[in-house]
Amino acid sequence: MSTKETKITHIFLKTAHGAPMEPVGHATAITGEGLQNDVSRGRTRRQVLIVDTQTIKEFGLSPGTLRENIILEGQGLSGAQRGTIIKLGDAKLEVTLNCAPCDYLDDIKTGLQDDIEGKRGTLCRVLDGGVITVGDLAIISN
């Protein structure tokens, strides 16, 4: 088993469909549901979207633009395999699938939907709930 450590740089909540992402200093992950007060809470495989800062920088985006919940410092999260465990603060998440680029991305930047293929982010489900705070250590275990 390999382990990688990084840290949480941003946390966002989506309070309603189509609403702007709200930056927060911390969030509460709820086992089997997602993040408290996030509209995606309760979805089975799409509870939390995680992106890394390398992806944000590579495409010249602002944090929150990809509708991500959590941004991790550095690179290498995109393409994480299903079943990978990510410990964020007090919470433990499991990678369920990579997030496919959608039409919304071309509204942000022409061609982004095609360009970001394979780097859109990683969707997770919450295995163990807990508080997640900006600056917390993130431990990724394959």
What positions do the PLM features span?
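Metal-cofactor-dependent catalytic cores
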Residues: M1-N142
